[in-house]
């Protein structure tokens, strides 16, 4: 047993403050000099993570406290990235469950906690943000206990220590009346409550690969926990997959240990530690990296299957190749294959159509993050509307169902219930949540929730909070009506003119502004009615040599509606596509030529 080490994962709902708490822990444990400038949310290393305030990739870090090395793993709180969570928990011997003092346990708290309890981990519960004006700490503790009971926690797991904290201000207390100074009560609780790794140091080396990334100097890097034995640089190892088949044989060219947020080269790694190794070219996540004498793989949690997919194709619009540097199908294919290799929650399939690829994932957010990442890397591509992945059980078609928890002002609850009923959702619970708020729980088909976020925010005037979580597969619920309004489609290619836009404003909401480039078949707005309408946004004012007073007034344009990438993916209909380039996001019809559109519509209805 390695007494001088603890491995702990931090789990929570999205935006409950995991990453901020780790920042404070690192600052207080002496990881930085007193005069060192430190950025916010150190663990969110990607641009998208910092921008959106969400953790997408699980990352380990390490701090020292009273001579004990504590490895901390920051996990994603969003269920779309749950593929990471399941594997990461296998590296830990204990978990810190972080819950917002006002919001209480949320769907993703339930999702991640359920995974942790199933693996037999004993949590330490932290009620975070207790300094908020609407904090209700005592009630939240009761809700957390009820959640543990609902998730079949055993007696040892139910006997969890409770701490109250403010990760942002860097303090933690055992009782709310205690002096609020540092986070040392939390670190002391970790040393007391989390067991040291129970490992065999003398056995042959074996490690379970949990995370995979690539480094421009080291190549393929596998991060995981050493389950038994020791390993030194340049020793021979073999990689075995979950079926026990050998993947490859190689040498450990580099061994790295985590020190704060950086990786430090070491000559030897021991059982119980979380390390990063380089030197293998084919080994992947869930493989066992072991000494040549080891033949049995280490068990790894099976990953939940993807529930949603999009089709990604080469950009074939009139503006193709003008804004991005990576435009060919070969480049897109290689990038998607690389992503599917590193990210096990993403699946890659060649589509039947030429130059198109089917990408499966856990939800709109995960697929949207992949497309946005590729966009920033200089790719041009087109994306279809997300579609759910059905499965057949005993000859019956089944679809993914999600649990939806909605917190909304009581005045808007009827509008939300009505909207979700139209999307084949079934209400399972409804109760008042205090201060004029209502909490409603639904079971809804995933396909009915595509694009619902925008409508939900409109219906609740931006005050509602919606959280979703994969629940189960259930028999197909029947057809769901899509977008009610038709599209405004450009008839020509060129630059949109203010005069034309001004005269078309009463036809619907426009997506383009003055001097914006458009092409034939591009969707430039949403029609007021149910049918599509073709319009000319290039039409300028007729110039004459006769001037009449009052006819040259400046036109006033309504601000065009701007949609985010995920909103656009959800907005489009099956006969439409989203064009993604580094500079622009454009909606378009699948067939740009109006005659071809009519011909295809006739063929489909025949």
Describe the residue ranges of each PLM region:
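Structural and coupling elements of P-loop NTPases
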Residues: 1-606
């Amino acid at each position: 047993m390695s007494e001088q080490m603890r491995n702990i994962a931090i789990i929570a709902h999205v935006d409950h403050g995991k990453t901020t708490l780790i920042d404070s822990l690192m600052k207080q444990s002496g990881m930085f000099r007193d005069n060192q400038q430190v950025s916010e949310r150190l663990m969110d290393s990607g641009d998208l993570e910092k921008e959106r305030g969400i953790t997408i990739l699980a990352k380990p870090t390490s701090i020292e406290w009273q001579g004990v090395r504590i490895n901390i793993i920051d996990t994603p709180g969003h269920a779309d990235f749950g593929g990471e969570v399941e594997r990461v928990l296998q590296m830990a011997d204990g978990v810190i469950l972080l819950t917002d003092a006002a919001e209480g346990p949320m769907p993703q708290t339930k999702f991640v906690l359920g995974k942790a309890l199933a693996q037999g981990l004993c949590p330490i519960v932290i009620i975070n943000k207790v300094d908020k004006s609407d904090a209700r700490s005592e009630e939240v503790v009761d809700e957390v206990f009820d959640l543990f009971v609902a998730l079949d926690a055993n007696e040892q797991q139910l006997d969890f220590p409770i701490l109250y904290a403010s990760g942002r201000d860097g303090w933690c207390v055992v009782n709310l009346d205690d002096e609020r100074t540092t986070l040392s009560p939390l670190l002391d609780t970790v040393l007391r409550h989390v067991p040291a790794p129970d490992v065999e140091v003398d056995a042959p080396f074996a490690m379970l690969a949990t995370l995979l990334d690539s480094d421009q100097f080291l190549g393929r890097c596998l991060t995981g926990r050493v389950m038994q034995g020791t390993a030194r640089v340049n020793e021979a190892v073999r990689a075995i997959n979950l079926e026990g088949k050998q993947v490859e044989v190689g040498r450990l060219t580099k061994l790295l240990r985590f020190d704060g947020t950086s990786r430090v080269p070491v000559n030897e790694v021991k059982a119980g530690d979380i390390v990063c190794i380089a030197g293998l070219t084919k080994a992947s996540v869930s493989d066992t990296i072991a000494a040549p004498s080891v033949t049995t793989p280490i068990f790894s949690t099976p990953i939940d299957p993807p529930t949603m997919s999009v089709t990604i194709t080469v950009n074939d619009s009139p503006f193709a190749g003008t804004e991005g540097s990576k435009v060919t199908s070969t480049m897109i294919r290689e990038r998607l294959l690389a992503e599917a290799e590193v990210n096990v929650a993403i699946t890659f399939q060649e589509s039947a159509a030429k130059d198109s690829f089917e990408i499966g994932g856990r939800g709109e957010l995960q697929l949207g993050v992949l497309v946005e990442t590729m966009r920033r890397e200089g790719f041009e591509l087109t994306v279809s509307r997300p579609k759910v992945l059905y499965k057949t059980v005993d000859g019956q078609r089944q679809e993914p169902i999600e649990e939806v928890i909605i917190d909304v002002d009581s005045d808007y609850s009827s509008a939300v219930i009505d909207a979700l009923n139209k999307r084949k959702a079934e209400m399972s619970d409804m109760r008042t949540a205090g201060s004029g708020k209502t909490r409603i729980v639904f079971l809804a088909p995933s396909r009915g929730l595509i694009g619902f976020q925008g409508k939900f925010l409109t219906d609740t005037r931006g005050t509602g909070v919606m959280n979703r979580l994969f629940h189960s597969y259930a028999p197909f619920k029947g057809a769901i009506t899509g977008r009610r309004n038709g599209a405004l489609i450009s008839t020509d290619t060129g630059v949109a003119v203010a005069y034309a836009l001004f005269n078309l404003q009463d036809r619907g909401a426009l997506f383009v502004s003055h001097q914006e480039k458009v092409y034939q078949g591009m969707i430039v707005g949403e029609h007021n009615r149910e049918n599509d309408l073709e319009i000319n946004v290039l039409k300028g004012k007729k110039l004459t040599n006769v001037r009449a007073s009052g006819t040259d007034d400046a036109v006033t344009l309504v601000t065009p509606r701007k949609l985010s990438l995920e909103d656009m993916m959800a907005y489009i209909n099956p006969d439409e596509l989203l064009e993604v380039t580094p500079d622009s996001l454009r909606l378009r019809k699948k067939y740009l030529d109006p005659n071809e559109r009519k011909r295809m519509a006739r063929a489909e209805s025949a």
